[in-house]
Amino acid sequence: MLEVKFYDSVDDSLLKFAVIISQSNGKWVFCKHKERDTYEVPGGHREADENILETAKRELQEETGAIKFDIKPVCVYSVTGKTRVNDTGEESFGGLYFAEISEFAKELHSEMEKVVLMDELPDNWTYPLIQPKLIEKYLQIERQTYSKIQLAAKQTIEYIKKVIKPEINLLEIRKLCEEKMLELGADSFWYWNVGAFVFAGDETTISVSDKSGLRD
């Protein structure tokens, strides 16, 4: 039986793999190997001259054909038990990443037959005892992060309501908001487009405005 664990960090020398959970236009990105009828999240072994982020970027590009993407670390995972890539069964460690892909190459030049964009997670996994747990962990962390942003956003709005004055312009308000959000430990936030500022679904209107999305 395989055991999957998660860590905030481990010694870099222990990281032997990188797995990259990916989405594109709101859909999950999965790969189908030429020799298998199952689907998998892109990932692979770390090469001798790479840091683990370089491994993640290379594997993502090779296996999905990603040309333009944003990638960020999620956490460290480990697997204990024998697998096709670990015949000793000892605990092995990897870096878990998330990537948002905005552009793909027209052709793949790897062992992958094709890349599939899915609305839902697949039923036929290549690594059914590992990769579903990695995605579950990613979603859990995202929910926790979003809740943190929501709380920081509400506190920021209350702060702005207290300090705002008629002579303050939008750029000054934005600067105050960014400083307060950073002070509260939020590294992402909703921002505004000429006239209103929007945080995690809450809006304080200064004048008619459109909503904008999340910004890193």
Segments from the language model and where they lie:
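Glycine-rich, aromatic-bearing surface loops/beta-hairpins
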Residues: 136-139
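Unchanged
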Residues: 46-70, 77-133
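Active-site neighborhoods and metal-handling regions in enzymes and metal-associated proteins
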Residues: 142-216
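Acidic, metal-coordinating catalytic segment for phosphate/diphosphate chemistry
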Residues: 1-19
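Conserved hydrophobic "DFG−1" position in protein kinase catalytic cores
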Residues: 20-22, 30, 99, 200
